[in-house]
Structures are given as C-alpha cells and as structure tokens.
Design a protein with these regions (language model features):
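Glycan-binding loop/region signatures in secreted carbohydrate-active enzymes
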Residues: 263-332
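Conserved, mostly hydrophobic/aromatic
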Residues: 78, 156, 220, 261, ...
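A cross-domain feature marking catalytic cores of carbohydrate-active enzymes
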Residues: 55-57, 82, 114-118, 158-160, ...
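Acidic/aromatic/glycine-rich contiguous surface patches that form carbohydrate-binding/processing clefts
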Residues: 330-361
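Short, well-ordered coil/turn segments that N-cap beta-strands
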Residues: 47-49, 74-76, 108-112, 150-152, ...
Length: 361
C-alpha cells in the first residue's frame, strides 16, 4: 500500500523504498515455529467473520493493534505489514515478528498472515521467478519467514513487478508469478498454512493471472482503491462504475468465496498546479483537516466517495478520501456479485463508523 504514508496503490511500494530505511533484521530462523493457533483455548476465526485488515508497522502501531482487537468479531485475519523480499532473502521492518501482537491476535481468534512485498523491479523479478533455481531460493526464503513464528500463512503483495509498460516484460512477469505462486502455495499448504495473494484491481487480463491465482491461492485480495493516485490527477480513489468492472472480471475468473475486496481508510491531497505527488492522509487526518479549514463536506454520488477543497498559502487543494458513507454506498456492489469477503487498508487509518457499514448497519 508513499508506503509509509499511503502504504498502498500502484506507485506506493516504489515510494516506500525511497522514504524508508529498509535495514530491518533478517527473520530469525531459529525461532520456535508453533502450529497456527496452538495455544490452549484458542479458536481461530470461522467463516462467520468476513473481514481482513492490514496492520501497519509505522505510526501508532499499538492503536492499530487495539483497533484489531476491538473488532475481532468481524476479522478472520490480520496481516501485519512486516516483511519485504529481495531475490533470495526476506527482511523484517521495525517490529516484525512481535510475538506479543501475534499471540494477542490469536487469543482473539484472529489468524495472523503477514504481508510480504518485493523490492526487485519488474525486469529483475522476471529473471528471479522465471529461473527454477532462483525461484526455489525465493520460495525457500518466504517459507523460512513463515516458519519463524506461529504464523497462519503468507500474504504475497507483489506490486513493484506490475509497474512496467513493457509488454514482453509484463508477460514474463505474469508467467513467472504463476510459477512462483504455484510453488509457494503448494509448499505452504503442505505445512498447513494459508496462501493469500494481494493484487491490483484489473478489468481484464494483465500482470496478474486471476484465473490461475483463483486455483492455487486460498484467498485473492483485490485492492479496491487508487483509481486516482498520488502521481495522477485529482479524483476519487474508487468509483461504483470501476467496482462493477473489476468485480465482473474477478467473479468470472476467481471463485467468489476466495475473493476479498479491500476498502481504503485513507485519501490523497492534491495541490492544484503544483509539481510532485499528492500528499497522503488517513481518514482521521482528512476529517481533522476538513474541520480545521472549515471546508464543506461533499459526497460524490457517482463514485460513492467524499471530497472537499481548501486553500493553503494561496494554493487550492483538492482532497478525495473514503469514509463510512462511501463504504456503505459501495458495499452493495460486492453483494451484487456474490462477494462476501472484505479487507481494510489499514487498521488505525479508518473512519470508526466503517465497521458498522461493513456490518450493513
């Protein structure tokens, strides 16, 4: 999911790499690897919980963790955004592998499926995952991480490789990612762990082979945001029409019970006429900014998203974000296509009323 700020979206990972020092420790492989949810009395989430959410490693991580516990009755899975993979190793961000967080989530009946992003760009990643030896080393590193704590699986969130306009590279990445997910998911399943894949929303075949992923993965998380993003023109992060398009394609290619559509708990602040990228705001920051500047709240019915404008130092700013009203407007589209699974980017970012909206209240 810029990643320190926005954390997600098409350019998000790339900006993260320039904004964050990625010198986290290697995952300790000697740590005891208990089976998922093996503590006495632990009952991991059942199918009555239809939500998942990502837990950031920056900001007020304790508040984000408490947010998960407070809404444990709606969450079957939390994915701490803890790891990133290079060609043959996995590094942890600050706080990665926090056993207090893992144990606390398990006690609440929530699965812990950490997210792994990738650092290689599209061309390098294609080389890694197309080569059997290098692909095996990459999978080994992911499995080493998965076994280092009592994790319930792995969430593979590889977005850097999707950032290519070269058709040949894109096709090589697509074919290689199919091989990678085939191998990784099979080996995770052999260990009794889940294989989750997070993907960009697509309205047709592209880097991610939805049909293949729907066969090998336990769940496919579709990021239902950044239709307009920090490096582009101002506009809604998502829209009803766009949801219709990608849901139609997703449900044609992936079993409905494996699909999760993630909603944003953030927004973008575009300065009109200014060079550079839009600033990132969580819902809480956007709501506070609107109130501080006295801006009027507007809701765009066509997209199902709120927005407002304000002036700062003579420059007009346009802010688009998402709140509970917007989620309530867009959620029926998931139901229309028979999709029950939802996700949230990210814990601690969101409008508190989103949880009620997700319940249909």
């Amino acid at each position: 999911m810029d990643h320190v700020s926005a954390a997600r979206g098409r350019p998000g990972i790339a900006l993260l790499l320039t904004a964050v020092a990625l010198a986290g420790p290697l995952v300790p492989v000697a740590a005891a690897a208990a089976s998922p949810g093996t503590e006495a009395g632990v009952e991991l989430a059942t199918d009555r919980r239809t939500g998942s959410a990502w837990l950031p490693y920056w900001g007020d991580t304790e508040a984000a963790y408490q947010d998960a516990l407070e809404h444990a009755d709606q969450l079957h899975t939390v994915s701490p955004f803890w790891f990133e993979a290079s060609a043959d190793r996995v590094k942890g961000h600050d706080g990665a592998g926090n056993e207090g967080v893992i144990d606390g989530l398990h006690r609440a009946g929530i699965r812990v499926v950490p997210t792994v992003t990738e650092t290689p760009g599209a061309a390098e990643m294609a080389e890694v995952i197309q080569d059997p030896r290098r692909r095996a080393a990459h999978v080994d590193a992911l499995l080493e991480m998965a076994g280092s704590r009592s994790y319930d699986g792995v969430d593979l969130d590889y977005e850097m490789m999707a950032a290519t306009g070269n058709r040949a590279t894109r096709e090589r990445v697509r074919a290689g990612f199919n091989l990678l997910t085939r191998d990784l998911c099979a080996r995770l399943h052999a260990r009794g762990k889940e294989c989750v894949v997070t993907v960009l929303a697509q309205v047709r075949g592209d880097v991610y082979d939805y049909r293949h992923l729907g066969k090998v993965a336990d769940r496919v998380r579709i990021m239902g945001y950044d239709l307009h993003w920090s490096g582009g023109e101002a506009g809604p992060l998502s829209s009803k029409g766009w949801y219709e398009q990608f849901l139609r394609y997703a449900t044609d290619t992936i079993p409905r019970n494996k699909i999760e559509v993630a909603f944003p708990g953030y927004g973008w602040d575009w300065a009109k006429g200014a060079k550079g990228r839009a600033g990132h705001l969580t819902w809480k920051e956007a709501d506070s900014l609107r109130k501080q500047t006295g801006a009027d709240y507007h809701f765009d019915a066509a997209s199902g998203t709120p927005h407002f404008t304000y002036r700062k130092n003579g420059t007009e700013h346009e802010v688009w974000y998402q709140d509970a009203h917007g989620v309530a407007e867009q959620l029926p589209l998931l139901r229309k296509y028979g999709v029950q699974g939802t996700g949230l980017w990210a814990l601690g970012f969101e409008d508190p009323d989103v949880w009620g909206a997700l319940r249909g209240q």
